[in-house]
């Protein structure tokens, strides 16, 4: 009799865990469709850059020509204001004007 009572007890806990594993596979199923999406996007990405590459090559030589001209002018403008600031400290009466200019900035 005691031997029979042992198998009866384990039979009850077995059916209880059954509903738990049923929920777990449902979570795994949505993970599967997420994987194929990135695979499809990877194929689309390489197709786009191929046609875009030949287009920028002819445009690049035209754009850099006007660009270098602008920075040269900007550098020259920065050098000009630096020159008048140097002679100002040589004169005794103008250091006051320098203070006002720095305060305004």
Swiss-Prot record:
Function: Sulfur-poor seed storage protein.
Alphabetized GO MF terms: nutrient reservoir activity
Cysteines joined through disulfide linkages: none
Keywords per UniProt: Seed storage protein, Storage protein
Residue spans of biased composition, Low complexity class: 23-39, 70-83
UniProt-annotated stretches for the region Disordered: 1-105
The UniProt record lists the keyword NAD: no
Tissue spec. comment: Developing endosperm.
Compositionally biased tracts (Pro residues): 10-22, 48-69
Protein name: C-hordein
């Amino acid at each position: 009799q005691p031997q029979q009572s042992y198998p009866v007890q384990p039979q009850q806990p077995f059916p209880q865990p059954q509903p738990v594993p049923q929920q777990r596979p449902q979570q795994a199923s949505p993970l599967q469709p997420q994987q194929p999406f990135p695979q499809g996007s990877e194929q689309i990405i390489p197709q786009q850059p191929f046609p875009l590459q030949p287009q920028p090559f002819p445009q690049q030589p035209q754009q850099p020509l006007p660009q270098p001209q602008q920075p040269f002018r900007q550098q020259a403008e920065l050098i000009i204001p630096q020159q008048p600031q140097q002679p100002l400290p040589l004169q005794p009466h103008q250091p006051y004007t320098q203070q006002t200019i720095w305060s305004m900035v």
